[in-house]
Amino acid sequence: MVKISLILPLLVLLTLSLTLAPCSCIAQAISKTADGFDLPVAPPMGAGFYKSRGFRSGGHLGEDWVTDGGSAKGFRQPVHAIGNGIVVLARDIHVAWGNVVIIRHAWIENRQIHFADSLYAHLDKINVREGQQVGKGQQLGTIGTNHGMYPPHLHFEIHKDLGIGVNHAAGTRDLRSYWLPTDFVLARRHLAGGGRNVPTPAANFLLPTTEHPWYLGRFWHSPKKSTHPKSSKSSASHRSSSTSQKHSSSNKWKVNRYTDP
């Protein structure tokens, strides 16, 4: 009789293979190097927004941005590219993500070319297409709720590992694979060598095809009033409103069985 301990890993691998599909989103392309980076809401420095939830290794691998005075006021507010780059993903991923845009950036630092992906999730609308060149500050879409799953906010990540896409299991869940988003921007507000044409690596991501077990296992939870803990002020000294104001519309926006990625 085959031991259960041997069967379970095989079942997990089979399930993963059935619920993830490769996406050759764009081939290698030429894009312009960044001349600096801004925050993705109310650029350059996010005036009128605050960071309601920050990065935590092994947990929340990005930042959540909402408007001062309550998340409802941020619904359908513009979301902007943090810097020059090329759109490598722009589609509705469903599950815990909803509408997602990922931009691949190149920049010159210490005389070397570096690359990173910026991710913008839960959008209400997407205004760009895959393969499109974008400039710093260009509108990518609008703040949304992931089809009513969350209170309105922008989930924002920056990836060192260009293979992650929307599959957090593709990299280490810590600063080996991710940048602290606000710190990344503040350290690179102005860069030399912007506007140069450089070859950008192709984007080959694994995307969920149905309801990936990564969401249904680790992130399953019972419905709560809000998926967001108490806010913390960002290093950019963004204003924060009182606890009573944060996500004041949580009764209006349905909070589903998923937590924010």
Each predicted region: which residue ranges?
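Small beta-barrel nucleic-acid-binding modules, principally OB-folds
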Residues: G59-A72, A116-S118, H122, G163-T172
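Zn2+-dependent peptidoglycan hydrolase active-site motif and core
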Residues: G74-R76, I82-N127, P152-E157
